[in-house]
Amino acid sequence: MTATPREAVNGLYNTNGQGDGYVDVIIVGAGISGIDAAYRITERNPNLTYTILERRSRIGGTWDLFRYPGVRSDSSIFTLSFPFEPWTREEGVADGVHIREYLTATAHKYGIDRHIQFDSHVRAADWDSATDTWTVTAEQDGARKQYRARFVFFGSGYYNYDEGYTPDFPGIEHFAGTVVHPQHWPEDLDYTGKKIVVIGSGATAVTLLPSLAERAKKVTMLQRSPTYLISASKYGRVAAAARKLLPRKAAHLVVRMYSAITEAVFFALSRKAPDLVRWLLRRKAINSLPPGYDVDTHFKPRYNPWDQRMCLIPDADLYNAISAGRAEVVTDHIDHFDTGGIALKSGGHLDADIIVTATGLQLQALGGTTISLDGVEINPSDRFVYKAHMLEDVPNLFWCVGYTNASWTLRADITARATAKLLAHMASYGYTHAYPHRGGEPMTEKPSWDINAGYVLRSLDALPKSGTRRPWNVRQNYFADAIDYRFDRIEEAMVFGRVADRAPLAG
């Protein structure tokens, strides 16, 4: 007979005798990853108690943080939304405010919002091998509060919420206008009739350009080099047809799978036939822009498709803004800032009232939380990642990170289900700790994110390591991971035990 979590071992999976502030699971973050984890963990382990610690004052995570004009999904909303809660709006590329509303409604529908402690910034987590529990320290209203839990799930993403990346631009202090980073967009910034320069060519920059152009006098996207852009319809015909023929949830799952397959096929085609994909994207740009437009200078990257993340432009909105004369792209290098704007190395000058530094993110593992084992601090970047969601020799800790080439939620949901599955397995055997162990066999290292984006290359030393063979190989392949999950050998390279069965772990 399989025991339920609370029946597994007397006192090990319930709050009896554990004292105030104890729960079975602490989830860090109330965005996509945290909400998914809460749903999946309790779906499979309904008796487990949990608390979500969210540093912001609202649900949404990234989708509450980013408030810049035009913020939206950069992949299909049907793969970004949860498989268990259908996306019901018509658009397949969703605005940030609607994603935030969807997350809030989902958390409320399943009672997840009742478990959230807002304004709780997790600073540290220390594992105690004498009791097989984590002590999690959170900052709330300037004071520190401690929680204890058997398990910790980090759904806090992969980048620094406090500050984005801005290069040291020469003379930036002399600029007389306003400098804004999209990660901290001022609510009261009025850009109507202003001249705006957006520095960057990534997803944020290409989202900002057409949106700002609706009200600004002139918007210029200044890039050092081009990025591949792919245009897709904001309102998909497949979703509309599926909703007419199928019940709501079935339609959602069908469109979700269709979107995941098309994204995977296009990625594979980009890898296998880069010249063909490059030609297709170039033809789209030529057909969408005015005759004679210098497509090769501004929209022909030097690298192959998907060597860096490709940027989505719904209904070719960026090309349309350029064609309408409301926006432009300049490919050049910055020499220095001056009072009136940006002097270029080519000798040109971009006048500006507002400069937006869409120059990237700063990555960090586990939300910047200090992790220690029996009081000995560890560095996550020294550890290999196990099945993309646990750290080598770190017990009862899970970390959710999405794909670089597909929607975040595809891996987030696999991670949440794998976590729930492991917790159920542990409960059935009465285990109180589990950790992946590589042993002494040498392992070839590789970056856990195999993409050449600047924000990744700048921060390789901030992320855990990937190996080159399972289960330590971090892949960017949803379907391979989904198959692995289905046939998962849950005890592969894992050490299980009960409280006080082993010596304390060293860092």
Q: Language-model features: where?
A:
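Rossmann-like dinucleotide-binding core of oxidoreductases
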Residues: 15-22, 26-28, 32, 37-49, ...
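Core beta-strand elements of the Rossmann-like FAD/NAD(P) dinucleotide-binding domain
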Residues: 23, 142-151, 191-192, 345-354
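Beta1-alpha1 glycine-rich phosphate/pyrophosphate-binding loop at the start
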Residues: 23-27, 32-116, 223-224, 288-293
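Short beta-strand to alpha-helix junction loop
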Residues: 87-105, 117, 199, 269-278, ...
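Feature captures the FAD/FMN-dependent oxidoreductase FAD-binding
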Residues: 91-160, 336
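Glycine-/small-residue-rich beta->alpha transition segments that form the dinucleotide
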Residues: 127, 149-162, 183-185, 202-203, ...
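Glycine/threonine-rich phosphate-binding loop and adjacent beta-strand/alpha-helix elements that clamp
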Residues: 358-426
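C-terminal active-site-capping segments
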Residues: 413, 417-507
